[in-house]
Amino acid sequence: WLLDISFKKGDVIYIQKKNNNYIINQEPKVNGAIIVLDPYTGDVLALSGGYSFKKSEFNRVTQAKRQPGSAFKPIVYLAALNEGYSPATLILDAPYVVDQGPGLPKWKPSNYTDEFYGLTTMRTGIEKSRNLMTVRLANRIGMNKILSMANNFDINEGLDENLSMSLGSGVVTLIELTKAYAIIANGGKKIEPKLITSIYSKDGNKIYDTRL
């Protein structure tokens, strides 16, 4: 249900060959970031904090605080499972309105499709990333339980106790979010991202190894 409009037919991207690899040869208008993490060992297999360290030393993996959006929803559903809910639990997918107080507009979250689906299982809710189900579920179990679950994944900052947090309106770093997903993939066992796995002396002798 997502449409990728980043590229279209006829677009030209300039690249150059370097050391048997191809790299982009034009400066992008925006910077991105990526981290590849082994969920079982914590080893960082790849990391790029931006297009050019020379042009910007700001590391967008470890320093940039960004809204995770729907990527935060698994934390909500894990909190629900921890409270006794199951994948088969039915949650109403219907309009939801929050009164934010005097002088403030009412908050009316919506699904990506702008449609409503009635009673739906939690499993479908996370699978289809349903906003209205997630907000209703968050209100039912309490945002304090969700923030507590986030803390279990070492996401401790940038979150407030309001319902919009359940849809990822807080801020996290990419490495924090990736670590949280790694913990899920690792069956709930916590890991720490390791940027260095071993160090060798100039003579080739190993003087440090994270596995020892």
Predicted regions mapped to residue ranges:
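Extracytoplasmic
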Residues: 8-12, 29-32, 39, 53, ...
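Conserved catalytic neighborhood of penicillin-recognizing serine enzymes
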Residues: 40, 85-146, 190, 202-212
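A short, polar/charged loop-to-alpha-helix boundary motif
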Residues: 53-64
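Short, charged, amphipathic alpha-helices and their helix-cap/turn boundaries
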Residues: 141-157
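Active-site-proximal helix/loop microenvironment
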Residues: 152-207
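Active-site SXXK
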Residues: 41-42, 62-93, 125, 180-184
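A short, well-structured edge-of-sheet supersecondary motif
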Residues: 26-54, 149, 195-201
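Beta-lactamase-like hydrolase cores
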Residues: 2-38, 123-126, 139
